[in-house]
Amino acid sequence: MATRSQNVAAAPQPPQNRGNVAALGKQKAVVAGRPDAKNRRALGEIGNVMNVRLPEGKPLQQAPAGRTANFGAQLLKNAQANAAANKQNAVAPAAVARPAQRQARKAPVKPAPPPPEHVIEISSDSDQSMRQQSEGSASSVRKCSRKKVINTLTSVLTARSKVACGITDKPREVIEDIDKLDGDNELAVVDYIEDIYKFYKVAENECRPCDYIDTQVEINSKMRAILADWIIEVHHKFELMPETLYLSMYVIDRYLSMQQVQRRELQLVGVSAMLIACKYEEIWAPEVNDFILISDSAYTREQILAMEKGILNKLQWNLTVPTAYVFIMRYLKAGASADNKSDKEMEHMAFFFAELALMQYGLVASLPSKVAASAVYAARLTLKKSPLWTDTLKHHTGFTESQLLDSAKLLVTSHSTAPESKLRVVYKKYSSEQLGGVALRSPAVELCK
């Protein structure tokens, strides 16, 4: 075996390329001629199939058969080193020449494209919204050019329709700050006056008198008007606070809504109701004997006190209610802000209509805020104020002119018939010079037509 290996190793073999198929076939033929060729298979040299990248024109030298693996590995190492050196020599010039090629490519300047034509498209609102969304997403990519937004034909036609209908020409509501002059007045509670009147608006819907005349057997609306006329006269003679008058009428109507009263006790109800209101509102309230004298001793002390207790129990001692008086004061302030002055005549005229409203049974079930707004509206109409109903008044009252017309007509009618009426206490009271003689003004009969 050693002699055979030496002979094979000593025999010179021509150099063979990697892809030389003829030499490989010859080698296979020699191996096939051996006696044990059928029992075992010859192993090829690793160096013959090694994939080594060499420069062009230099063939790979194949290791002679029979050499050890160390010689093939050494040959492979040398070939890889030569390939790496040749590769560095070949890449360096290309890397140097590449910037020149890039600069040469940037030299030609392309002409600027012509500006795109603006086309107005007619599309639906949904298409327009989708287009706007797509444009919004693409705006981050196209930051370099921002074009002016072009209105579509649909938006143009919509705007023209609004102009034709007068929608865009409608001015915005101008709400005056009616409390700006009371900033230094601690009693005006400017910081939460709006919250107070919001509470009044909610509270006025509770514990309201209802339409009770049909439930009363011996009392009608005319008798109630007579009682109201007498209460107003007593209030004026005693020179009581205005809050006392409105609270007295509330107690009367509220009690009559819950309890049937005989005809002979109707005035007793009025006397006891005024006594309750005086104790609630006045600093120096009249005594029971004063009411006995003013009623011409029609009732005794015990009767007045017993009726007082009965009324309070029926009302469950609930006397803290907003009346028309608190709303009138607020609405007059809003009207004075609109007129840019404090009008005393306007104040007297508004309270004149408010006291006429106390005698009208048709306004018993109305909200105090609506009665107050109707009184202010009728007063402005009688005094020919312009504008008649401002945005500030609408904001603070919560009512429009159309909502106040029916109540205002009733008040203006009462004003026109007051001089010939038998119940003339209110008319005489406001005909005096002390209250400006506002009752003598010509009524606004044009509202009743």
From Swiss-Prot:
Residues 1-34, 90-143 are annotated as: Disordered. Keywords: Cell cycle, Cell division, Cyclin. It comes from the Eukaryota. The keyword Disulfide bond does not apply. One of its GO terms (molecular function) is cyclin-dependent protein serine/threonine kinase regulator activity. InterPro entries: Cyclin, Cyclin-like_dom, Cyclin-like_sf, Cyclin_A/B-like, Cyclin_C-dom, Cyclin_N, Cyclins_cyclin-box. GO terms for biological process: cell division; G1/S transition of mitotic cell cycle. One of its GO terms (cellular component) is nucleus. SMART domains: CYCLIN, Cyclin_C. Residues 90-102, 121-134 have a biased composition (Low complexity). Belongs to the cyclin family. Cyclin AB subfamily. This is Cyclin-B1-1.
